[in-house]
Structure formats: structure tokens, C-alpha cells
Amino acid sequence: MKKGKMIIISGPSGVGKGSVNGELLQNPDLRLKYSVSMTTRKPRNGEINGVNYFFVSNEEFAKAIVNDELIEYAHFVGNSYGTPRKYVEQELKKGNNVILEIEVDGATQVLNKEANVLSIFLMPPNLTELANRIRGRQTEDEEKIKARLDKALLEIPLKHNYQYVIENDNVANAVAKITDVLHLEGLTDIKTPTVYERLEQIVEQIVKEKYMYFVNNWETNVKLLAKNEEEKNKAKNFDAETYLIKLLTKKVYHKVLGHGDFSKLLDKDFVDFKIQKLMFKINFFSVEQKHYNNDEF
């Protein structure tokens, strides 16, 4: 049986991790299990021990750290949070994927220690909306809300440490994005093509219809500019059409994950508009696109 994977869904407090995960867990094709965290904070109204959290004392939490019973842990606003190791490892062996709904500090620990991980950072649409969501819970005073917002300002720049950055503008849109990411990563039982694969077909159509002149010139340019044997070999084997299609597909996909209506990725006019802007950023005189992973691309 293929081993499951730890799926980190992290982001600042109030971004909506719980709401998104609750919807994801309803889909049996995702093979998801929820890792119940351990915490020293008091239960909120409606929270159940062993379901929402394992509520423990400070002494019990400290003992779990000493005994290496936690995959990660963090301390914040006078409380401690951690992920019990035993349950996660049991579910992974069964072939299930385990959601770790954790704060950014804990996610950083897991990313530094564990290899079998898929990491997703949930972004709020803006800081005003984040503040509204935290206040909407009506569980904390203004001092604690301010502390959470201050921490969010430090956490959001760390989003680049994650494999995927996904905006939670509304739960349905965020769930659709994460579902496709899990499908793309081969972690589901879904049989239909991914949105990414269907997007790639649309991009291929657009490139063939509108950009083959640039493709052909690109291949010619890199051959003419090759200065040494290594560059000449790269130029000789350079398939500009395939490279451009994959490059544009990845950039359009990730841009919409980060902001936008996910269903638009199957709208040819929308994709065409995105590609028009991206084409200005490509260096048609080099095989290497040094700014490829840059947000400015």
C-alpha cells in the first residue's frame, strides 16, 4: 500500500483553516484524516476534547515534548499547541493523507524535519478581512486580536517557503483549489483530469494559434547566441514550444491559486488575457528564465 502524506495547511490565525479543512474532509476521494492538535488553551463554546483538540495541562504538554510525542509545537498568546506523532504515523501507514492544521511556527518545524510533506499556505484576501474574521469569532479581547494581527504581519512573508500559496477569499473557491492541488500531486482517488491538465491543453491551443513565431525565433536565437559546447548542446535540445507551454501553464495556475476565481482557468479568453501579460516577461534570447520563480514574472 502506498504511504499517505502529511498535508500542512497553514497560515495566519483567522485565515479560515478550520472552515476549509472541514469541507475538504467531506470528500472521501481525498483520503484525508484530520490530525487533532494538542493544546493548553481552554475549550471554546462547542469544542469537544479529542475532536477539535486534545485539551491538556501545561504539565502534560511539557511531558509530551520531553518524550518526543509531538511532531511540532509552538507557544502563542499564553498557550501551547502541538501535533501528536502517534496518530499521524498510524494513518500514513494506512495510506491516508493527514491534514496538519497548524500555525506558521509549527509548520516551519515540520518543513525543516520531515520529507513526506505537502505544504499549503492559506492567504487572507487582505488584512482588514483577516481582522474581521478574528473579531467575528467573538472569543478574544482586543489585546489578543492585536497580537494575532501583529503575528500575521510576520508570518505572511514566509509564504514563499511553501509549495503552494492559496487565497481563501471564500471557502468553496479555496476548497476547489486545494482539491485540484491534491489531485495534481497524486494524492487522491479522483479519476477525472486535473484542472491543471485541462489548463495546459488550453495554453497549448493558444500558443499554437498565436505564438509560434516567437517559439521559432526563440530556438533560433539561443542557437546563434550559444558561446560554448554546453550552451550549444542546450540550444540543440531546446524544445521552445513545450517549454513555453509548461512555463505559462505553471505561472497562470499559481497566479490564480494565489488570487482569483479557480473556475476561470477553464475559460480560454481569461487564460489568453493572462498569457498576453506573461509573454512580455519572457527572455526569448535565453534557455534559462532566471526570473521564472520570481513573483514579478
Curated annotation (Swiss-Prot):
<feature type="region of interest" description="Unknown">
    <location>
        <begin position="204"/>
        <end position="297"/>
    </location>
</feature>
<dbReference type="Pfam" id="PF00625">
    <property type="entry name" value="Guanylate_kin"/>
</dbReference>
<protein>
    <recommendedName>
        <fullName>Guanylate kinase</fullName>
        <ecNumber>2.7.4.8</ecNumber>
    </recommendedName>
</protein>
<comment type="function">
    <text>Essential for recycling GMP and indirectly, cGMP.</text>
</comment>
<dbReference type="GO" id="GO:0005829">
    <property type="term" value="C:cytosol"/>
</dbReference>
<dbReference type="GO" id="GO:0005524">
    <property type="term" value="F:ATP binding"/>
</dbReference>
<dbReference type="InterPro" id="IPR020590">
    <property type="entry name" value="Guanylate_kinase_CS"/>
</dbReference>
<keyword id="KW-0067">ATP-binding</keyword>
<feature type="binding site">
    <location>
        <begin position="11"/>
        <end position="18"/>
    </location>
    <ligand>
        <name>ATP</name>
    </ligand>
</feature>
<comment type="similarity">
    <text>Belongs to the guanylate kinase family.</text>
</comment>
<keyword id="KW-0808">Transferase</keyword>
<keyword id="KW-0547">Nucleotide-binding</keyword>
<dbReference type="InterPro" id="IPR017665">
    <property type="entry name" value="Guanylate_kinase"/>
</dbReference>
<keyword id="KW-0418">Kinase</keyword>
<dbReference type="GO" id="GO:0004385">
    <property type="term" value="F:guanylate kinase activity"/>
</dbReference>
<feature type="domain" description="Guanylate kinase-like">
    <location>
        <begin position="4"/>
        <end position="183"/>
    </location>
</feature>
<dbReference type="InterPro" id="IPR027417">
    <property type="entry name" value="P-loop_NTPase"/>
</dbReference>
<dbReference type="InterPro" id="IPR008144">
    <property type="entry name" value="Guanylate_kin-like_dom"/>
</dbReference>
<dbReference type="InterPro" id="IPR008145">
    <property type="entry name" value="GK/Ca_channel_bsu"/>
</dbReference>
<keyword id="KW-0963">Cytoplasm</keyword>
